[in-house]
Amino acid sequence: MASEVDRSGRLAALLPRGPGHQFVFYGDACSGLPGLPHEKTFAAVNGVVRRLEPLPEFVLFLGDEIAGLTADAGALRAQWRHWLDCEMAWLDRVAVPLWNTTSNHTTYDAMSEAVFREIFADLPRNGPPGQEGLSYWVRRGDLLLVFVNTMWSGLGGEGHVETEWLREVLHHQRDARHKLVMGHHPVFPINGFSGAYQREIGPEHAGPFWDALVDGGVMAYLCSHILAYDVQVHRGVLQVCTAGAGTAHRMPEGVEYLHCAQGALDGEGLRYQVIDSEGRVRERLSWPLQMPPVSGWRSVPAGVSEAPLVGAPCDDRIVLLRFQGRAAPAGDGTAQTLLAAFDPEAVGALAPLWVGVCGTEQRLTVVVGPEARRSPHYWHGPSLAPGQPFDLQIVLHAGMGPGGLLWRASEDSPWSSLTAASAWGVERLGWPTHWSVGHASRGPSDQPFRGGALVVSSALSEVRV
């Protein structure tokens, strides 16, 4: 959704529903150099933060505040001083604390790590040995904030992060009702931009790192680095990337935009809104998802039937699907349809939405093709065991972009985003008039499901924040 632009008026901040916390998080300005373009773009985003009513209780900046990347310590200090004393002078950092993470533009060698410690001398020195002032944690009542260093030179530099200390902090602070972890690099690829160490945390760290978040009951990992806004969920924990604070590039261009994010935590969960540099609310999320019980979902008949949701693309709808059945025997890797959405009047057109299994491993696959004669995009999930029963739930969340195609194995299991290399999701999909269960749009012989006892049910919900 996008709100009307009012460049002079106040912007309503999301507030906790009862006791809680409200805050701003953003990253990647690459400024600190007076008179250069990023000073102007960063000022535009800060202008939006300054219009929030009320102002945030604290601000999380997720790295790449300055251009940095210089061998001259004096020049690096000067960039930091300009960023703090000029570009962020509007923020009363006594009333509204500012906490920062390390990043590739700011802590790229031993010298720059020392400058970071010097500039942010007031940050807690409670990190792991050797990382004091680079990794740290803060407790605000029932809220735990942990800041990890994804640039730790002692492990190898960019894309390397320590995990044992993180696990220990989460364990010792386990009484915190709300837990957020902040770092610069994502763990999971974003918008198809992928590369170990340079674009996301290295593979030897990524698994233990995410295990620590899941085991520690963390609500979200907030990161930046990839110049985009993106949200995914993996085993019930959100990865939220916000890297639009001023850097003039986009990943990809034409899709992403300058922005900040403002959020609220309370007893019901996390809500946030993503606001562009003109003050429009462009995207939003409330987590955990609120949805009707599975027992109340509507049965979808086998074969072709009218679709329960028809119309133009929208970003405020959630489609819930449940697939039960027995997987086909092993051996044949051709595609099998669970559900296809299509318009019979669109002669010769491929189904804009297809859900099924592909390959000899019978991997859950969702195909979304909103534009005729353009290659569709693919999302992949778990494999089905040949000949065995399965019960899968899928969410198509039009407010979550590419991370909004989710799956889980049961009502008690955590949600995870399907894997994709797309920069968009079902928000681009015009919803066709008909659904078919057990075969694709051209009839019973078109990519049929070869297993047995297929039962499909569905429900609709709306994005609410």
Question: How would you label these PLM feature ranges?
Answer:
Residues 1-77, 190:
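N-terminal active-site segment of His-dependent metallophosphoesterases
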Residues 311-329, 349-354, 454-459:
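A carbohydrate-recognition surface predominantly in extracellular/luminal proteins
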Residues 340-367:
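Glycan-recognition/cleft segments
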Residues 368-391:
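Short, aromatic/His-centered strand-loop micro-motif at the edge of beta-sheets
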